[in-house]
Amino acid sequence: MKPQWQQYINIIKQVVKPALGCTEPIAAAYAAAVARALLGVEPDSIAVQVSDNLYKNSMGVFVPGTGKIGLAIAAAAGAIAGNPDAGLEVLAVITPEQVAKAQALIDAGKVTVERTETAEFIYCCVIAKKGDREALVKICGGHTLIAEKRLNGESVFSVDSTQAKATGSICEGVDITIESIYRFAQEVPFEEIKFILEASELNGKLSDEGMANPYGLEVGRTMKSGIAAGIIGEDLLNKIVMLTAAASDARMGGANLPAMSNLGSGNQGIAATIPVVLTAQCYKVSEEQLARALIMSHLGAIYIKSHYPPLSAFCGNTVTSAAASMAMVYLAGGSFEQSCFAIQNVISDSSGMVCDGAKASCAMKVSTSSSAAVRSFLMALSSHNVSGQGIIATDVEKTIKNIGKMILNGMSSTDVTIIDIMSA
């Protein structure tokens, strides 16, 4: 195996993993669970401080197992019922009695949530107290990246800035491009990448749940009703939109099922997975070809997103769906050049979509970017592509750099404005 291939596998395993619930409030639940474990007893008060972006993405989304929204219930539930060893599945097991106990803590005014100024896009600090005992847990740079733990003011764990590598910089120093990802996905031994098939299983179950039960805006179920009424057809495009949205409906609606996430986002894990799986079914390819396509989609998404901060005013479903579209071209028998066309087309189509927090309507954004992925891969197969127009360069690598530049240099004030509007 080529030396960098093991690096690619390690990257995927590090940031493509099961996550129960929207990862921003779950970060608070995880920090609270770790703080409770450090404290040794259930706390009688909890203080939560978060970055603006983490706050934004926690305002409108349900916390699994609670039927409730927000950072306060996430932190309280994490402290009462969370498993500190379960990472993003910290709330996998929670009872109604524990939810009631967490809510009682909130109702008594014992849980506070504040925004704090920080250069970190992902930042959460939880202070749990019991009498005169106090435990502090600080997360920085990634949803489960613990930077510091303190007990009664004494440091028991800390990492310096060189060790605390943010998930957003995961590709730094790695020899990786769209072409190297494409070749890796095609040529790496199947046994080395079989693990990615779990993404199909987990996100497929979430989609089934969203179709079977009413969650959020019921985008997927609404599409199904349209098909049943004969208003729209059950073709590949509409199936992808319907089933991808259904998974997001369930996730944003608090379904007690994990998503296979991508770089800290469950919705983006869904967008990287379900369109690829349905395309594989359409073309009747082997399990091995599906695994290779999923690797292409997930690693492609990680690579593109490594060019900008992990949380921003930009909806990451756009570039995730661009990577999915690349993989769809591969499944349809297209060339590498046509896979690049697909990326260019999706980014041209949907790059104006902003992130205004995690909430039920994310299912609509997931469906929008996924529909762009289908259109774009079909155009690419006919060798139709956007090139040298607007922010789309003549070369896919330059386009990816342009996206990063647009977000880093051009959207910071947009992010502040969105957060101000949401907080008003």
Curated annotation (Swiss-Prot):
HAMAP family per UniProt: UPF0597 (MF_01845)
Q: Which PANTHER family match?
A: UPF0597 PROTEIN YHAM
MF (Gene Ontology): L-cysteine desulfhydrase activity
Please give one Pfam family short name.
SDH_alpha
Family recorded in the similarity comment: Belongs to the UPF0597 family.
Q: Which domain of life is it from?
A: Bacteria
Q: Name one GO biological process term.
A: L-cysteine catabolic process to pyruvate
Q: What name is this protein filed under?
A: UPF0597 protein Sbal_3070
